């Protein structure tokens, strides 16, 4: 699948980066905004991360490895979804990068997903990530 197309999404959240970070790394909060995913990880560099659930009527168990952690600033991991229909080999993994930036007490949360095989695939992924970030924003802002 190796591709050069980048998917991206961003949202400004009315909360400090520390609260947004908690939402990115707390399995209970992740379940609330990530389509009901059950997440297993300690979110330490080199650790495995697994996402299990159901999306659009299909069960999935996605997985990857945490590549880089800068608390309250950056979370980067690999990601593979068997629902892609691709073989589970490194060249079919995406790298997902969350970047948090303090903007006057709020947080600009940006997400990028690399290795999309086409412009259409990148656009579809961007739309899904945008939906997820909007849900994350609602979870964080409602937990004041």
In which residue ranges do the predicted regions lie?
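A conserved amphipathic terminal alpha-helix motif
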Residues: 108, 114-144
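Hydrophobic-ligand binding "helix-grip"
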Residues: 39-42, 59-104, 114
């Amino acid at each position: 699948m190796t591709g050069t197309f980048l998917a991206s999404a961003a949202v400004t959240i009315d909360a400090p980066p520390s609260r947004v970070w908690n939402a990115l790394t707390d399995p209970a909060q992740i379940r609330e905004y990530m389509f009901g995913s059950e997440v297993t990880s300690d979110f330490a560099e080199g650790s495995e991360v697994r996402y299990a659930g159901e999306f659009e009527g299909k069960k999935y168990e996605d997985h990857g490895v945490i590549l880089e952690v800068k608390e309250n600033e950056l979370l980067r991991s690999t990601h593979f979804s068997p629902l892609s229909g691709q073989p589970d080999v490194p060249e079919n993994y995406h790298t997902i990068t969350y970047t948090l930036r303090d903007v006057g007490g709020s947080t600009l949360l940006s997400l990028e997903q690399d290795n999309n095989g086409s412009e259409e695939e990148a656009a579809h992924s961007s739309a899904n990530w945008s939906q997820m970030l909007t849900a994350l924003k609602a979870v964080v802002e409602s937990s004041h």
